[in-house]
């Protein structure tokens, strides 16, 4: 292995984990706390913040009005540039001796106007009274700092070794699963600022935006994800607490049961895509169409599989309404009842990492991954027409919009946005459905989800044979 390969692996793994830990996890925590505050009619995550000088707080209205004025000025500039282009004026406006065209000026102003308006609109919400709270996002940061600085209490009769490693084991599957998730198309390093050809093989160095491309990619995810049951069982056993033991037993049986549905619900997708590689699944969805005009995303071909996999994944990471293993009204807190401070926070981090990884996997299999309708590797196109504006006024816009680096960044952003929305949807279920009893959870798995999964496999196989 050479230096650049190792560096690439480290950077790609850091990107996946960084997005999950530093973007998704805080957003999920903030969303969940805001939802709970709304339902319980309380303040919410706004107590944690940085105290700001009085002069800054008093000048927020003035800053907001300045933002509105700046947005209005940018909008007027965009309109002026558009009028000059329409009237066929000089292509070089000669503003401050800057070598830019009217088209470039229009692009900058058209992007800047709404950005400044939104910035002015949200400015007051960054503060709560005299504190900078960033929409309540700093509250979670302060909670994490507090958790790792408080005393770690260990039950006197607990198995100290198993008690200590259980939360670590809970985090390992989430870290390992990120290695096979493709988060973008291949990056051709010699074509970053050029437009890729629509067809053919492209020579030159390529950076695959995936740590490991395995021919058993999805099976690897099931194999590694299934080891999470070990941590719950160990935590329940080692805590020397009967409620924790009951929670561990519940978690183990529930996770093992729903893994069956998780696997069977995706068999139809394997048959459709004819591959187990996650990146090939995305390519199949991006290269085909559904009914001739819709993207060939898995949710259109396998809607039942999506519903089954979505709810089975919620049961797998034990979120409401499938949180019987940690039901507060029955067994207090389940397998991690005796955990506190940093170790308890590790359980929470592992749980939200599972939500993030599961959302990314659903986005890849059912929502085209990084695929964006109307965007191909050669740039923006629709109904056979390629986005290419003539004239030097629009040269910068056309070149920038179709550049390989722009296409790649938009694709990565689309994938991350899909996963984020799916994660928020799974958290929304918590505040929509009541908790099921443990027996109801098991009956739902074996009497409804499993038969429907088998039916989906049977119907998919017949349809593929008929239309192949």
Each language-model region and where it sits:
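Selective transmembrane helix interface/packing segments
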Residues: 1-468
């Amino acid at each position: 292995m050479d230096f650049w390969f190792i560096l690439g692996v480290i950077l790609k793994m850091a990107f996946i984990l960084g997005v999950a830990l530093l973007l998704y996890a805080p957003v999920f925590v903030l969303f969940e706390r805001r939802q709970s505050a709304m339902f319980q009619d309380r303040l919410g995550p706004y107590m944690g913040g940085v105290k700001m000088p009085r002069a800054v707080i008093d000048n927020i209205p003035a800053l907001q009005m300045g933002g509105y004025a700046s947005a209005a000025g940018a909008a007027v500039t965009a309109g002026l540039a558009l009028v000059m282009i329409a009237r066929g004026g000089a292509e070089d406006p000669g503003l401050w001796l800057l070598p830019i065209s009217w088209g470039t000026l229009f692009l900058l102003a058209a992007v800047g106007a709404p950005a400044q308006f939104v910035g002015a609109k949200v400015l007051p919400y960054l503060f709560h009274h005299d504190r900078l709270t960033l929409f309540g996002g700093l509250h979670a940061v302060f909670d994490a700092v507090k958790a790792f600085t408080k005393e770690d209490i260990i039950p006197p009769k607990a198995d100290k070794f198993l008690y200590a490693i259980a939360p670590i084991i809970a985090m390992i599957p989430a870290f390992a699963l990120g290695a096979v998730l493709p988060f973008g198309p291949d990056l051709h390093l010699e074509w970053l600022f050029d437009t890729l050809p629509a067809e053919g093989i492209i020579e030159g160095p390529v950076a695959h935006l995936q740590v490991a491309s395995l021919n058993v990619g999805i099976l690897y995810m099931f194999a590694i994800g299934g080891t999470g049951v070990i941590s719950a069982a160990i935590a329940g056993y080692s805590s020397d607490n009967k409620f924790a033991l009951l929670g561990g037993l519940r978690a183990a049986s529930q996770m093992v049961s729903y893994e069956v549905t998780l696997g069977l619900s995706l068999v139809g997708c394997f048959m459709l895509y004819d591959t187990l590689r996650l990146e090939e699944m995305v390519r199949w969805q991006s290269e085909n169409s559904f009914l001739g005009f819709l993207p060939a995303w898995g949710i259109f071909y396998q809607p039942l599989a999506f519903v089954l996999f979505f709810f089975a994944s919620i049961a797998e990471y034990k979120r409401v309404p499938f949180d019987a293993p940690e039901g507060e009204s029955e067994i207090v807190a389940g397998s991690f009842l005796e955990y506190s401070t940093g170790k308890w926070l590790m359980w929470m981090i592992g749980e939200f990492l599972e939500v993030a990884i599961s959302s990314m996997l659903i986005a890849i299999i059912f929502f085209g991954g990084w695929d964006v309708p109307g965007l191909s590797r050669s740039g923006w196109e629709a109904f056979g027409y390629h986005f290419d504006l003539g004239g030097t006024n629009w040269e910068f816009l056309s070149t920038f919009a179709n550049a390989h680096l722009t296409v790649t960044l938009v694709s990565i952003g689309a994938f991350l946005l899909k996963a984020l929305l799916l994660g928020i949807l799974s958290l929304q279920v918590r505040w929509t459905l009541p908790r099921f009893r443990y027996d109801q959870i098991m009956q739902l798995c074996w009497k409804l989800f499993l038969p429907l999964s088998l039916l989906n496999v049977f119907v998919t196989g017949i349809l593929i044979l008929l239309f192949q």
